[in-house]
Amino acid sequence: MALNSINTNAGAMIALQNLNGTNSELTTVQQRINTGKKIASAKDNGAIWATAKNQSATAASMNAVKDSLQRGQSTIDVALAAGDTITDLLGKMKEKALAASDTSLNTASFNALKSDFDSLRDQIEKAATNAKFNGVSIADGSTTKLTFLANSDGSGFTVNAKTISLAGIGLTTTSTFTTAAAAKTMIGTIDTALQTATNKLASLGTSSVGLDTHLTFVGKLQDSLDAGVGNLVDADLAKESAKLQSLQTKQQLGVQALSIANQSSSSILSLFR
């Protein structure tokens, strides 16, 4: 190729190629700064983009898991609250039965104690029946178990129901006494019911702790997934900012180089003057 030619300006061609390359890099850096992402679409890096999208979907699905587990927590909390009420009522029922077992009582006092006992018994059934969260109960005998979401793959966390209604703790809606001797026998029956109720509540407490632990794990897992996606696609803005300044300087120099190269043709004309 001729070093001095008016048909082909090799220097200008090289300068233009370099300038175009710089402009392309500059556009990429500006896009990363504007979006905050180094991988904004599949054309930037298909493999990484696909991985990030899949991980983002998994992280987002964890919200449904957390919602389900939180419903589980609330369902158990309501049952435990009802259980506290029921154990308190059982304690009062034992007190009434013990007092009624006193053979020295007159009929009016005995009947008053029996009436109080029956009222306390009925309150137990009401407490168990109303122990619902969002229409769901694990305390009233309406279900044997509930399964909540445990992971994004649809696997479940199962909580076994614990019936703490009268039937669930060995009593009936007609459990009562009509004599001092029957009241004395009822004391043992109430003790057994109280033990049954506390055992069931302890089991629910264990399930609640398990839900709490798993919910904490799911939250940490979601945070880790979000961080992993960020590592894959987020731009290092400090690095990109420094690169932007460097490319802007390089662009200015490229424009000057192209201008100088374009002047070479004019220099050839001066040889013929």
UniProtKB/Swiss-Prot annotation:
Coiled coil: none annotated. Flagellin is the subunit protein which polymerizes to form the filaments of bacterial flagella. In C.crescentus, the flagellar filament is composed of multiple flagellins of 29 kDa; 27 kDa and 25 kDa. The keyword Ribosomal protein does not apply. This is Flagellin FljK. Belongs to the bacterial flagellin family. GO terms for molecular function: structural molecule activity. Gene3D superfamilies: f41 fragment of flagellin, N-terminal domain (1.20.1330.10). One of its GO terms (cellular component) is extracellular region. InterPro entries: Flagellin, Flagellin_C, Flagellin_N. The keyword Secreted applies. The lineage of its organism: Bacteria, Pseudomonadati, Pseudomonadota, Alphaproteobacteria, Caulobacterales. It is found in: Secreted; Bacterial flagellum. It comes from Caulobacter vibrioides (strain ATCC 19089 / CIP 103742 / CB 15) (Caulobacter crescentus). Keywords: Bacterial flagellum, Secreted. It comes from the Bacteria. Transmembrane segments: none annotated. Its main location: secreted. SUPFAM superfamilies: Phase 1 flagellin (SSF64518).
